[in-house]
Amino acid sequence: IQADXPTFQVIQDDN
């Protein structure tokens, strides 16, 4: 998982 992009933020937002 890359925390340098919006992808990580989306995963955290899902929680």
UniProtKB/Swiss-Prot annotation:
Main location as per UniProt: plastid
Subcellular location: Plastid, Chloroplast thylakoid membrane
GO CC terms: chloroplast thylakoid membrane; photosystem I
Key word Plastid present: yes
Gene name of the record: PSAM
TM annotation in the entry: none
GO BP of this protein: photosynthesis
Keywords of the record: Chloroplast, Membrane, Photosynthesis, Photosystem I, Plastid, Thylakoid
Function: Essential for the activity of NADP photoreduction.
The protein's name: Photosystem 1 reaction center subunit 8
Keyword Plastid: yes
